[in-house]
Amino acid sequence: MSGPDKGSDSGQTANDPKQKKARNGQMETYSCARCRKLKKKCPRQLPECSNCLKAREPCNYPGRAPRRTKKELRDAIMKGEVLPSMRRKHRKIEKELKTADLRHLESVDDRPVNQVMGGSMPPLGAYRGGEQQYNNGPPISGIDGNDSINRGKAQSVGSYQILPPQRKSKLVLDQNPKFVHSQSSALKTNEYPVPIMSPHIANQVYPEGVSSLISALNTMNDNVSANTPIALSYLQLQKLHQEQQQIQQQQIQQQQQHQHLVQQHLQHVRADATSILPPVTSQTVYTPIPGPRTSQIPFGFTHGYTASAPPPLMQPYSMPTSPFESREKQQQFDNIQYHPVYKIPPIAARQSPIDEIIGIENGSISIDAGSITREVVNSRMKGPHSTSWVNEDGSPKPIKKSLLEKFVSAYFEHNHRLFPMVDKVTFLKKLATINSFESIEMLAVNNPELPKTFIFEIYMIMAIGCTTLQRAGKLTTDEGHLYEHLAYLAMRNFRDILHQQDITTLRCLILLGIYSFFEPKGVSSWTISGIAMRLAIELGLNRPLTAKEMGDMSAVEVESRYRVFWSAYCFERVVATSLGRVSAIDDEDIGIPLPRALYDSEKEDIEVTNLIISLRKMGGKIYKEVHSLSAGRKDITMEQKQLIIQKLRKELDDIYEEECEKRRLKGKSRSSKRFEKSKESDSDRGVTEEDVKSGNENLIGLLASDDVSMTEHGQSIDNTLESTPLPTTIPTTIVNDSVDQHSTLENIPTSATSKDQIETIITKPTANIMNDQTDSDPLPKVDNKPISNNEEGPKSLKEGNSEQNPSENISPEDVTLTKTDNSENKESSLRSNSNISFHISNVWLEMRYTQLQILLYRPSALIPKPPIESLTVLGEFCLAAWRHTYTLYKEKLLPLNWITLFRTLTICNTILYCLCQWSIDLVASTIEIQQCVEILQHFGEKWVFAMKCADVFQNISNTIVEISLSQGQDPNIDKLTRELFGASNAYLEILNENNVDVSWEDRFR
């Protein structure tokens, strides 16, 4: 502020009576803050005014803000600061700024405006107008850069904008060089003119530098007369404005058309799924339609960036190889197709086919349970890679309804017994309304109320049933691979299911988990099991229902809750136990009853379900008390540890004996019913009592077969012999400290002098394993005489075996070396009449019993180095478990999934440990080792490392044969020792290299 101004201000202040009273201490100079806020007259008393004193509010005198100079006021106006009042000097400053800007506009040169505005206009410098014409209207601000109006003068005044007069008069400095640079760069290319927005759009928030031009033109439209010379140029600008509006409308229409085409294309792709999409390789790429690139134009300044024209459609819109394809490859493709300037990105970038299936939109995950679950499943689930269900021309093959019905029937006959979460009656009623495979997808279209869960359940149940029939050998090669295609179609409906996060989501997660058993790696099963169990706990399915909740639900709904939870429990527990990991829920946190049968027809299935639950509970209990970290921290004596083992052994024996007793009684009841039916029809069919007494069982069985279901026939096969005892004591042929290490080789006849003869003798029982079983199987016979051991076992098994024929009394000559035509026919007949479900088989029951015994006795955190007595029992259980496993394998009743593979590897690892500890009969174990090799080689078709493990055991078998030829000489025993330890190390290296994550406590040295 100048000198005279300062003097005048100071003089006015000195003569102010308020200042005099303030100096005398009578009152404050200015009002308090509260009175200012309430707009009341403040008495300004000290220390508090009467207004604040009455209101009992604090009184604060802030004083007066310091006065600003003209320069400070000018800077404030330029910065757009709202001034408290508009005095004369303020208006004077604003008028000076307007006048300077008008002079700048009138002195502009004769450059064509179309270099700046993209239009065809006379130069603005050709017109002159008085200052009075512009008093009520703001000037046009310049745009910095090479294409500005008289760049030098624009920079001298400053690039600023003035808001329309309907708002408060203020000036806003344009200080956004980034946007100015982008605008000037776009103008230099002459790709598109800068749009001039209509007045009704002018209230939007536009980027700086552009809104000044738009605001100025909108203001001139209201204040400039059409008769003035400058108005002639404005009319042309207005015409240009209208042209830009038309261009904008065209762009909006193109955007809408593009979105419409995208929606039609996606609907077309979904419709193609009803006819089974052909397989697509990973080399399929999305190719844009060739054509000239549309010039860039600022479209909608809401987002503050330049958007290009609508992107072209991608051709062809091929489906991916798998719904679980790796996201890394898809992300690389998205980076090529997607450009950040697109306001609406292309189809491939906005939502890839994989993301459409799993449900990840725009490559981002919202923070909710459904989205997180989708991303987790997408990252862990590998899924099917291709399908062979196509013709040579690539068109999908038709699927017969009868084949699909077989898949569904196989699921409910086998898998439903383990996981009864699907309401069988309701599901089959809905399924009966489907006439053909092509109408499955149309169900959701024609019936919007039909949930996507039903479509998912249909496809996934058929996929799981297909794996069951494939294992049983009841499908052709092409039909056997159809499960991958069905699972692919099921995952197309998985996105909407995860959003629900309810009991239907849990049911579908369990189905997906069952299917994941057949993946080469079990990581997805572990992930899905954890998600499923957490969702079950979140829904409160493990807690008992209150009386009010029970009253609001029907009996079917209550039972459905129980079954869904126990299905999730069985699924999670089998995964955790197979991997040697802790379970997600403790048995003490479960307060609901076991499933019960609602219909008479499902009593047998529910009995199997409850047996499975008991075995799952037992496996979890063994892990918790023997293999967990807390078990290893127990500071107890060896006697106390053995008591824990004995207690668990007794519980396991009780479960086994109770189930055997049920099956024995059920078998007798069925046998008597069949005999009565056959006896009643004997007179009509010509069968006499002499035929029955003479043992003409084949004729009776043939006549009775018409009235016996497949399930009963499968059960009768298992009940032909009573179960034999399992080993609990040390056999005399077991190598230990009190027995000569070379006595195990004494069973080899002295006449056997060649390696081929030794191999023939050792592998004789393997040749007829299905017809001439080994000693502890319920079905095995050699010359129609059961083979069994003399060791004591569970009471229920021991009582039923009056006849015993120890294996050591059978010479090698009693066993045929090769299969005859009769044995082949017998094996084929047995397989054709057997059921696809093995849970009613005694062989399966004994296999699971021995596997749990292995889990109990093997080296653990509780007992890292078991005594020799325990190792002897462990070795016998390993051999028995392997015989049962091989029996189911030969009968095609062994599921070839990663659960079975990991159990197999556990047995193999334990056998190696026992061999290194000399607790298994070498010659007796050779049979089981050869069986290990055969099964591991079969698993090698999908799991490559299983083939390498088979080679390790083959080398061990060859070494044992060489030692047998040498009659147990010491150098060869040393060679075997080195071979065993070397094989053990190689075995573990193979598992580690292939990331086989199984928690084992075995230490071979």
UniProtKB/Swiss-Prot annotation:
It comes from the Eukaryota. Residues 673-693, 792-801 have a biased composition (Basic and acidic residues). Residues 32-59 bind DNA. This is Negative regulator of pleiotropic drug resistance STB5. Residues 763-773 have a biased composition (Polar residues). One of its GO terms (cellular component) is nucleus. Residues 1-28, 129-151, 666-693, 763-831 are annotated as: Disordered. It is found in: Nucleus. Disruption phenotype: Causes a modest increase in azole resistance but does not exhibit altered susceptibility to cycloheximide or caffeine. One of its GO terms (biological process) is cellular response to oxidative stress. It comes from Candida glabrata (strain ATCC 2001 / BCRC 20586 / JCM 3761 / NBRC 0622 / NRRL Y-65 / CBS 138) (Yeast). Keywords: DNA-binding, Metal-binding, Nucleus, Transcription, Transcription regulation, Zinc.
